[in-house]
Amino acid sequence: MNRDTSPDLHYLSGFGNEFASEALPGALPVGQNSPQKAPYGLYAELLSGTAFTMARSELRRTWLYRIRPSALHPRFERLARQPLGGPLGGINPNRLRWSPQPIPAEPTDFIEGWLPMAANAAAEKPAGVSIYIYCANRSMERVFFNADGELLLVPEQGRLRIATELGVMEVEPLEIAVIPRGMKFRVELLDGQARGYIAENHGAPLRLPDLGPIGSNGLANPRDFLTPVAHYEEAEGPVQLVQKFLGEHWACELQHSPLDVVAWHGSNVPYKYDLRRFNTIGTVSFDHPDPSIFTVLTSPTSVHGMANMDFVIFPPRWMVAENTFRPPWFHRNLMNEFMGLINGAYDAKAEGFLPGGASLHGVMSAHGPDAETCEKAIAADLAPHKIDNTMAFMFETSQVLRPSLQALECPQLQADYDSCWATLPSTFNPNRR
């Protein structure tokens, strides 16, 4: 199948906007969504990301004007090669950590390379999150859409070129991409191989967190989110369309590219964001603030302040707190924390937590800085210093995350993780304050 592999990439700026884009002049109807005859002989199609009657501020929908409607496809058949999945592991309250997963030796495209790590909901439920690590070494020739949830991609190695129905975006490590539920896309590897993390959000679409007393600016600013402009493929020839439905891959063969949207308008859009543009907030007096100040995106629940999923980062930042234990404090949390590392080192773990690795601390699992970090922090000269060349992140969720059977049985699971706290001494002396 022939396709344009090098369009000029342009983006629209903003978050939650009503965007509009057309690859041909006049392709968008004026004053209505579904005219009797759409410009250029296109078909009008609505892609809904939320229910019709949601509050307008929460509504996500986009009108597509395409060469062929999505309904033009044969029957989907279950693929013989299914993604790694199956049952979650048994109940396990232990703290878990994994070394980086290897890039596969055999040819593996983006959708073949998902390793399930943890989940807290079945795909048919309108809440919860499933977490994966992806490892790939070849570009996709087929096209994919995920009926189970919204996808948040966090590259750790290798740039991705993501061709979506609405346009093309390139995403590199230290950037993230979000693809709405049901949107068709293809991932091409610009560096030959790639590895990273995926949060599959089954709940409310991701949005910016409220800023509260921070005010009207700070954290991830809306103007730094980028949505691709319209770009279409007018191609004849066989192409496989794969959908993920209730955790399984089903496919059909089309005789055209399904990435054939010539124009579109709406708010249900793919986007990318450069984590280096995050406006980090921290203390300028004492104590380590709660990690919620590092929230980039959140998927809320019906309980105010309780997240279905938060995406939190730990970026480069200045540490200036006086008379303060500066690393993240020891903690037992109502929330469940899955952490990854994009580059550098995490300031609470001196050893063992590597880029491409991961950790899971479940509800009420005691965690905090390891023994080496703790010892250094207590004795440190509290001059201002910058934590630099680092980017850790966390998928945090209010529902218990259960590790997958594959994650519990893979050789990258560190059996000795608990030992990083084993040498924490008792320094208590009742006779010396």
Curated annotation (Swiss-Prot):
Its keywords, alphabetically, are: Dioxygenase, Iron, Metal-binding, Oxidoreductase, Phenylalanine catabolism, Tyrosine catabolism
Active site location: H288
Q: Which residues bind homogentisate?
A: Y346, H367
InterPro entries from the xrefs? HgmA_C (IPR046451), HgmA_N (IPR046452), Homogentis_dOase (IPR005708), Homogentis_dOase_bac (IPR022950), RmlC-like_jellyroll (IPR014710), RmlC_Cupin_sf (IPR011051)
- Which GO molecular function terms does the record list? homogentisate 1,2-dioxygenase activity; iron ion binding
Domain of life assignment = Bacteria
Report the cofactors.
Answer: Fe cation
Q: What is its EC number?
A: 1.13.11.5
What Pfam families does the record tag this protein with?
HgmA_C, HgmA_N
Q: Where does Fe cation bind?
A: H331, E337, H367
Under the heading HAMAP family, the entry gives:
Homogentis_dioxygen
Similarity comment: Belongs to the homogentisate dioxygenase family.
Subunit: Hexamer; dimer of trimers.
Function, please? Involved in the catabolism of homogentisate (2,5-dihydroxyphenylacetate or 2,5-OH-PhAc), a central intermediate in the degradation of phenylalanine and tyrosine. Catalyzes the oxidative ring cleavage of the aromatic ring of homogentisate to yield maleylacetoacetate.
What is this protein's record name? Homogentisate 1,2-dioxygenase
Gene that this polypeptide is encoded by: hmgA
